[in-house]
C-alpha cells in the first residue's frame, strides 16, 4: 500500500468520525443529508459483498467493516435516534436520478459481466455523485455548520488523495483502472467549488455558504 492510499483512508476515516461525533455530541443531525448517507450505505454494501469471501489483508477487511458499519450507524442516528432533528424539508434531492443512471452505466461499462463486478462498478459510479444531495442541501439552506464543512472537506481530500494513489499505482505497478480514475475525477470536480469556499471562508473563521 502506498502513502497516498493510506492518507486517503485516514482522511476518509476522519470524515466518518467527524460526522458521527458531530451528530452524537450535538444530539442533532441538522444540516446533514440523510439521502447522501443512504447513498453511501448503498455504495459500501454493494462494493463489499465479498467481505467474507475474498480476504486480502486484515487492514483491508477491517476498513471494509468500518465503512459498512459506520454508514448504517449514521443512517440509524438520522432516521431513528435523532429523527426529530432531521431537516427533511431541505433534503429534497431526487436520488433516483443518481441511482438509476449509475446502475444502467454499471451494466454497460464494467470490467467483467458478473454480479459482483457489476455491483462493484455500480458502487464506484454511485460514490462519485453520492455527495450531491448534501451539496444541494447546503445550497438550499444557504450555509453549513463549520463541523459539517470539516466533514465535507475531509471527504473531498480523501477522493483527491485516491487520484494520486491511482497515479502512483500506474507509475510503479503498471496498474490502470479507467473506471475508478474517471469516477474519482468526477467526484473531485464536484468538490472544487466547495474547496474554494472552505479555504477562503471556513479557514478564516467564517461560516460556509454556497450560492443558491
Curated annotation (Swiss-Prot):
Site (Important for recycling of cargo proteins with the sequence motif K-D-E-L from the Golgi to the endoplasmic reticulum): 193
Membrane topology note: Multi-pass membrane protein
GO BP terms: protein retention in ER lumen; protein transport; retrograde vesicle-mediated transport, Golgi to endoplasmic reticulum
Keywords, comma-separated and alphabetical: Cytoplasmic vesicle, Endoplasmic reticulum, ER-Golgi transport, Golgi apparatus, Membrane, Protein transport, Receptor, Transmembrane, Transmembrane helix, Transport
Region feature Important for recycling of cargo proteins with the sequence motif K-D-E-L from the Golgi to the endoplasmic reticulum, mapped onto this chain: 204-207
Signal peptide: none
Positions in the Lumenal compartment: 1-4, 53-58, 111-116, 169-178
Family stated for the protein in its record: Belongs to the ERD2 family.
Pfam families documented for this protein: ER_lumen_recept
Organism: Xenopus tropicalis
GO terms under cellular component: COPI-coated vesicle membrane; endoplasmic reticulum membrane; endoplasmic reticulum-Golgi intermediate compartment membrane; Golgi membrane
Cellular compartment(s): Golgi apparatus membrane; Cytoplasmic vesicle, COPI-coated vesicle membrane; Endoplasmic reticulum membrane; Endoplasmic reticulum-Golgi intermediate compartment membrane
Cytoplasmic domain ranges by topology: 25-32, 80-92, 136-149, 200-212
An example molecular function term from Gene Ontology annotations: KDEL sequence binding
Main location: Golgi
Region feature (Interaction with the K-D-E-L motif on target proteins): 47-48, 159-169
Name of this protein: ER lumen protein-retaining receptor 1
Transmembrane region(s): 5-24, 33-52, 59-79, 93-110, 117-135, 150-168, 179-199
Annotated site location: Interaction with the K-D-E-L motif on target proteins: 5, 117
Protein purpose: Receptor for the C-terminal sequence motif K-D-E-L that is present on endoplasmic reticulum resident proteins and that mediates their recycling from the Golgi back to the endoplasmic reticulum.
Amino acid at each position: 500500500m502506498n502513502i497516498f492510499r493510506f492518507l486517503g483512508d485516514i482522511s476518509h476515516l476522519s470524515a466518518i468520525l467527524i460526522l458521527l461525533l458531530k451528530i452524537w455530541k450535538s444530539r442533532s443531525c441538522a444540516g446533514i443529508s440523510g439521502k447522501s448517507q443512504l447513498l453511501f450505505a448503498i455504495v459500501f454494501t454493494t462494493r463489499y459483498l465479498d467481505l467474507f469471501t475474498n480476504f486480502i489483508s486484515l487492514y483491508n477487511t477491517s476498513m471494509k467493516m468500518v465503512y459498512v458499519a459506520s454508514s448504517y450507524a449514521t443512517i440509524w442516528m438520522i432516521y431513528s435516534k435523532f429523527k426529530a432533528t432531521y431537516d427533511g424539508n431541505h433534503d429534497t434531492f431526487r436520488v433516483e436520478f443518481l441511482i438509476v443512471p449509475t446502475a444502467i452505466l454499471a451494466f454497460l461499462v464494467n470490467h467483467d459481466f458478473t454480479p459482483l463486478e457489476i455491483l462493484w462498478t455500480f458502487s464506484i459510479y454511485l460514490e462519485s455523485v453520492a455527495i450531491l444531495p448534501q451539496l444541494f442541501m447546503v445550497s438550499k439552506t444557504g450555509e453549513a455548520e463549520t463541523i459539517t464543512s470539516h466533514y465535507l472537506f475531509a471527504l473531498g481530500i480523501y477522493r483527491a488523495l485516491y487520484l494520486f494513489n491511482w497515479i502512483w499505482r500506474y507509475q510503479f505497478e503498471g496498474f490502470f483502472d479507467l473506471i475508478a480514475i474517471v469516477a474519482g475525477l468526477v467526484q473531485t470536480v464536484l468538490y472544487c467549488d466547495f474547496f474554494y469556499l472552505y479555504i477562503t471562508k471556513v479557514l478564516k473563521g467564517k461560516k460556509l455558504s454556497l450560492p443558491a
